[in-house]
């Protein structure tokens, strides 16, 4: 349920953008424990009850949840582990897999499929979580730990077992399971695997399916070729809950508004035209043909056009992108490089030049368009400063708009900005998110630490929550401080104690 508080924190910081949350360690004792007992939801982290609370309450904030499973290797503590389904070579030797907890042993995937045992284990999980679960991420599938050939036939069968329970399919390798997978870890986690593991770079595939999945080569210029500022962007996976030691919250938010908001905005439209440029040398890729202009439309006929600034990778304008929606500019400039390090982000180095004012007209829970009064605009200015924008239709007749700076406590620092001739002029701090509304708007309603024994266990609610939920004794000082990675903590100084009564024990 700590993850539920993190969902709420991100919801406040993004004013309710959708979230996709992968629960790496939902089973048994945590990550990779007791594979492949899919229904063994970890008791010490709350079991099925808390997991369902996380998913049902998180959905109210636009979050969808998936789990990490394995169908190619298993661990001796698993109930599914037995002599009949271990993978052996022709000499009877075990085929070993990953080794960082207990030694993983290959799970004979042909046996698991033919006997129906794997499908039964997924069905057992479905009885516990139903469609509260959104997707299943199948780790390592395709490296032939479970069979001599994890071929397309086997893969489609595995996908159908997962899809039949109402769950999306996701995989690890960048090119895995093109037909069914909607997310590939190594495509999106850009530091994984090197340039040849960065997802699917077929123009035909992306033309047809860009709006359907996160499987594409994203912006990571040091890889060259398709990774040098793709016009369509690409999901750049960062996080702050500890995977690979990543725990910097502010870096996560900066990355999200630098790369992922624009990528997800574009994915609301379908590609109808793709214009290529002339062949160039782009990093390690020779005779690379960059996309120069891409046109997209939605079901209502709204037209989005993306244009590259130059055909020459040695020209700074190669990274510059202009987006127009129905003829009005909604984004311009060069996004900060996707291979920028966390230290670069933390210290404000190597910033790009992109700024945007993107209309956001979709409900994060349902995906449907919101009422006109609930439409909003996200503003981001990488360098900071003042920019002037043409407002979209439905906004031009307003007298003024309300502008809010977004933080992990929600909308702050309300400003009223006049609308002149259908335009608005915005002043922004560098790499700081803002939301523009048609009128005054309150914050998302949040109750911290639902289902837990302490209210606001992570001190996410700021000073007001501290004062409301903790009793102070003594003359010292209690305050909320941020760690070096921007995660809130209680800081006590002087003669003081803070107490809160535990509940529901």
Tell me the role of every PLM-derived stretch.
Residues 460-492:
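Extracellular glycan-recognition surfaces and repeat-rich motifs
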Residues 377-378, 424-425, 487-490, 499-504:
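Beta-strand-rich interaction surfaces with strong enrichment in secreted/lumenal proteins
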Residues 1, 71, 78, 85-105, ...:
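Active-site-proximal substrate-binding groove within the catalytic cores of carbohydrate-active enzymes
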Residues 2-5, 9, 49-53, 117-120, ...:
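Extracytoplasmic/secreted proteins, especially bacterial periplasmic and envelope-associated proteins
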Residues 1-79:
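Aromatic- and glycine-enriched glycan-recognition loops and surfaces
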Residues 365-367, 384-389, 491-504:
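Short beta-strands within extracellular/lumenal beta-sheet-rich domains
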């Amino acid at each position: 349920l700590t993850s539920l508080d993190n969902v709420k924190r991100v919801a406040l910081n993004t004013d309710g953008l959708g979230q996709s949350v992968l629960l790496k360690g939902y089973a048994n004792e945590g990550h990779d424990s007791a594979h492949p007992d899919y229904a063994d939801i970890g008791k010490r982290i709350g079991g099925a009850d808390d997991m369902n609370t996380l998913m049902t309450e998180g959905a109210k904030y636009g979050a969808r949840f998936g789990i990490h499973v394995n169908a190619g290797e298993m661990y001796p503590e698993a109930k599914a582990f037995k002599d009949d389904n271990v993978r052996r070579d022709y000499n009877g030797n075990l085929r070993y897999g990953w080794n960082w907890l207990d030694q993983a042993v290959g799970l004979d995937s042909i046996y698991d499929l033919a006997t129906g045992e794997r499908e039964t284990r997924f069905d057992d999980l479905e009885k516990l979580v139903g469609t509260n679960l959104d997707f299943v991420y199948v780790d390592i599938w395709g490296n032939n730990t479970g069979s001599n050939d994890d071929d397309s036939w086997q893969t489609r069968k595995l996908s159908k077992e997962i899809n039949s329970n109402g769950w999306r399919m996701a995989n690890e390798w960048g090119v895995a399971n093109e037909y069914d997978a909607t997310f590939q870890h190594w495509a999106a986690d850009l530091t994984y695997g090197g340039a040849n593991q960065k997802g699917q770079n077929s123009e035909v595939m992306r033309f047809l399916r860009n709006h359907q999945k996160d499987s594409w080569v994203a912006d990571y210029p040091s890889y060259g070729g398709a990774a040098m500022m793709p016009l369509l962007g690409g999901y750049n996976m960062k996080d702050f809950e500890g995977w690979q030691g990543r725990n910097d919250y502010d870096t996560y938010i900066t990355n999200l508004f630098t790369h992922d908001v624009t990528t997800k905005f574009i994915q609301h439209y379908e590609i109808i035209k793709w214009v290529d440029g002339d062949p160039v040398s782009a990093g390690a890729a020779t005779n690379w043909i960059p996309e120069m202009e891409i046109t997209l439309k939605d079901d209502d006929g709204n037209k989005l056009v993306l244009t590259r600034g130059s055909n020459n990778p040695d020209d700074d304008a190669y990274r510059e992108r202009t987006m127009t929606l129905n003829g009005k500019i909604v984004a311009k400039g060069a996004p900060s490089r996707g291979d920028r390090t966390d230290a670069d982000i933390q210290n404000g180095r190597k910033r790009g030049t992109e700024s945007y004012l993107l209309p956001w007209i979709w409900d994060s829970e349902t995906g449907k368009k919101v009422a006109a009064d609930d439409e909003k605009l996200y503003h981001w200015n990488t360098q900071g400063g003042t920019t002037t924008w043409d407002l979209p239709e439905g906004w031009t007749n307003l007298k003024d708009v309300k502008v809010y700076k977004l933080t992990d406590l929600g909308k702050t620092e309300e400003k009223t900005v006049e609308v002149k001739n259908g335009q608005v002029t915005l002043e922004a701090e560098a790499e700081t998110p803002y939301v523009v509304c048609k009128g005054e708007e309150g914050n998302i309603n949040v109750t911290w630490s639902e289902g837990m024994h302490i209210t606001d266990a992570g001190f996410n609610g700021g000073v007001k929550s501290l004062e409301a939920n903790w009793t102070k004794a003594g003359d010292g000082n209690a305050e909320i401080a941020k760690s070096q990675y921007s995660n809130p903590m209680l800081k006590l100084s002087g003669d003081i104690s803070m107490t809160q009564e535990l509940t529901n024990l």
